[in-house]
Regions:
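Regulatory N- and C-terminal appendages and interdomain linkers associated
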Residues: 676-677, 703-707
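A conserved ligand/cofactor-binding region detector
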Residues: 1-685
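Low-complexity, polybasic segments enriched for Lys interleaved with small residues
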Residues: 682, 687-702
Length: 707
């Protein structure tokens, strides 16, 4: 949408998955995964382009030969699959249209030689393996078979896409010498990393380039965006698996590694640094290192994240090639998350400042002229109330729970991961529950905690956390002593459609990851755009949200990134925080005693013994932040002003802005100039036809003209 709206020629590539990651169903609080079939249904938007199909090769062995000065390489006895493209057209706000090309994997044909030899199952297995590649998004990779399928998916995507890019370029220019001037290939995270050696393979094996010329072209063409600082997400593949599945690509990757090692040694004469920066080391292929080595640009997705990349994750690379490193803060599909999701708010903003903000998001800053207008603030709160009522009906229908639209809607919606610290939120909820049980008449602002998230199928602790949320919600929501003041809701099967109803209803946006662990986040931007006030740590894009709205319009708590590092160096001891905080100790004891007939020893044991993301260290400060949010909400005018300031400051987080920064600073491209539409001539005033026949003739004439 952003590329099309801004007028940049673009083609996105992905896989035509038959099913999404999974549909989430809680059974006795435990997440179970059901198939989420995308096809049929979604394919109504797809245009098949079988004539553009390409072949992708796996396994086999490599044979090399020389004919004079000509070097020939052939991959033999390989398993071949056909990548069939399907195009989806994405129109922007205006005349621009982007194309998303999705690849479906099919076996070229049944191996009749195997079939005729009676090896029916083996023949069918080959077809099944080919089709499995585009069967499901993110198959579980906690088994050798799962890892193999993931690697096949990644190579299938990059091989088909790079072949398509090269074909289209050669059709236009008949040479690859000008590839960097005409094409920008952007690697989004490490999943498409193999685009680098695959582009080298085509240039070396199919186009006859020498290594140095090919590498020069590749590294000027490819750019890389990193999306995480989590070590487990910086992909590493078993060298043995990589070599077995992709024999030719392994040879090229190995040569890249050898040459890059030599370059680093000549530059630094530091053997330790050579090993840290190596692409292949310790029996694994490091995809993030390959990305940085093979790209002309490396960027993070928030100002803090980009600094962390330079200071820690890729510090060795930064010390050698500092000019590679840039920042482009994430942006969101602005028009979806306000115009489509929140039509009431969109209409009211249009009434106040006009409609230019729909394509020029910084126009929202004009709303600040109304920050002291009590009538406008009251209108904003009335719209928020209507959106909360709309969401409350969804909760009643899906969960059977009545929630109070006048209570605080405290929202934490994101994937379930320990670093995102849903655990910290739960600890505070239990503390509030215990306080209300002990003091039923306490002055407590009614609050509804809303969770929505999915856990990776093989991530036990994340699933256990969901079960804990479900258990405590059952206890609280059925306790008549507190349920008029405190409610907890977990929304199953969180997706974009649910988010479009939930985000306009949120009062406070929980962005509470440990400082230094979240690359950026985009949920924080979507919630901010819809008037939610951020309650969070100085992590990811929260830093830039704070800059955009001012310290008075955001609630910040917790350790800062340098303080986290200092605490790690001194030695972090979770039990110290439990022993020195009676409220926290009571919460841990409450969980250890079991909740709703379930036990959560693994959850508390992790916190007490390790607490890898320092939830206990931030607990006391988090409680203060929650208490402050309640005080703010009680002052309706103050809360309304903070909400307006967040909406008005959200324009900087539009994807349109992010796309422009990528285009200017990384891709070095300019938008296409669309022909200006001619103004329609003023209609001539015509006398009304006296006879129906005259009307009919006129209508037929107009229809022919239109055709």
């Amino acid at each position: 949408d952003g590329l099309a709206t801004d007028g940049y020629q673009s083609m996105g590539y992905s896989i035509r998955y038959e099913a999404g990651i999974f549909k989430q169903k809680l059974v006795d609080g435990w997440q179970t995964e059901l198939p989420d079939f995308w096809l049929p249904g979604g394919d109504v938007w797809l245009v098949p382009r079988e004539e553009r199909s390409v072949e992708v090769k796996f396994e086999g062995h490599v044979e090399e030969s020389w004919d004079g000065d000509y070097h020939s390489v052939e991959q033999k006895d390989c398993n071949t699959v056909t990548a069939v493209p399907y195009d989806m057209y994405v129109s922007g706000k205006g005349q621009g249209v982007s194309r998303l090309r999705l690849w479906a994997s099919v076996k070229p044909s049944l191996d009749m030689s195997l079939f005729n030899q009676g090896e029916y199952m083996r023949a069918m297995e080959q077809s099944a393996m080919a089709e499995a590649i585009s069967k499901i998004l993110y198959p579980a990779d906690n088994s050798p078979e799962g890892k193999s399928l993931r690697l096949r998916q990644q190579y299938f995507l990059v091989s088909a896409s790079i072949q398509d890019i090269i074909r289209r370029h050669l059709t236009e220019y008949s040479t690859l010498d000008n590839l960097p001037e005409k094409i920008a290939i952007h690697i989004n995270d490490t999943h498409p990393t193999m685009a680098i050696p695959e582009l080298m393979r085509i240039m070396l094996d199919e186009c006859g380039y020498g290594w140095d010329d090919a590498w020069n072209i590749v590294t000027k063409t490819v750019a890389y965006t990193n999306h995480t600082v989590m070590k487990e997400a910086l992909e590493c593949w078993s060298e043995e698996l990589y070599k077995r599945l992709l024999p030719r690509l392994y040879e090229i990757t190995k040569e890249i590694d050898n040459r890059f090692r030599a370059y680093v040694w000549c530059t630094t004469h530091d053997a330790d640094k050579v090993e840290r920066m190596a692409i292949i080391s310790g029996g694994v292929v490091r995809m993030a290192n390959l990305c940085v080595a093979g790209s002309h640009s490396v960027n993070g997705v928030s100002a803090l994240h980009s600094e962390i990349l330079k200071e820690t994750v890729f510090s060795d690379f930064y010390s050698i090639t500092p000019d590679k490193f840039k920042n482009v803060t994430n942006g969101i599909a602005f028009r979806r998350w306000i115009c489509q999701s929140n039509p009431l708010l969109t209409d009211y903003i249009t009434k106040l400042i006009g409609s230019d903000f729909i394509t020029k998001s910084n126009e929202l800053l004009k709303l600040r002229e109304y920050k002291d207008d009590k009538k406008v603030l009251a209108d904003f709160m009335a719209i928020k109330r209507q959106n909360k009522e709309r969401f409350a009906k969804i909760v009643k229908k899906r969960n059977g729970i009545d929630i109070n639209p006048d209570s605080i809607f405290d929202v934490q919606v994101k994937r379930l991961h320990e670093y995102k610290r849903q655990s910290l939120n739960i600890l505070n909820i239990i503390a509030e529950y215990q306080m209300l049980k002990a003091n039923p008449n306490a002055d407590f602002v009614p609050r509804t905690y809303i969770f929505a998230s999915k856990a990776a199928p093989g991530y036990f602790m994340a699933k256990k956390t969901i079960q804990l949320i479900d258990a405590i919600s059952n206890v609280i929501n059925n306790d008549k002593d507190v349920n008029d003041k405190l409610k907890v809701v977990f929304m199953e099967e969180y997706n974009v459609s649910l988010a479009e109803v939930l985000m306009p209803a949120a009062d406070f946006s929980e962005q509470i990851s440990l400082a230094g662990t979240e690359a950026s986040g985009t949920g924080n931007m979507k919630l901010m755009l819809n008037g939610a006030v951020t309650l969070g740590t100085l992590d990811g894009a929260n830093v830039e949200i704070a800059n955009a709205v001012g310290d008075d319009n955001i609630i910040i708590f917790g350790l800062k990134t340098p303080e986290v590092e200092q605490l790690k160096q001194r030695g972090y001891h979770p039990m110290d925080y439990i022993n020195n905080n009676r409220v926290l100790k009571d919460v841990i004891d409450f969980i250890n005693a079991g909740i709703d007939g379930k036990t959560f020893g693994e959850f508390t044991s992790s916190l007490m013994n390790v607490d890898p993301y320092m939830a206990l260290a931030d607990f006391a400060d988090y409680q203060k932040a929650q208490q402050l949010s309640a005080e703010i909400y009680k002052d309706k005018e103050r809360f309304a002003k903070m909400s307006l300031m967040n909406i008005s400051g959200a324009g900087i987080f539009s994807a349109d802005r992010a796309i422009t920064e990528y285009a200017e600073n990384i891709w070095h491209t300019k938008p296409v100039a669309f022909p200006q539409e001619k103004s329609a001539p003023a209609p001539k005033k015509e006398a009304a036809a006296k006879k129906p026949a005259a009307k009919k003739a006129k209508a037929e004439k107009s229809a022919k003209a239109a055709k």
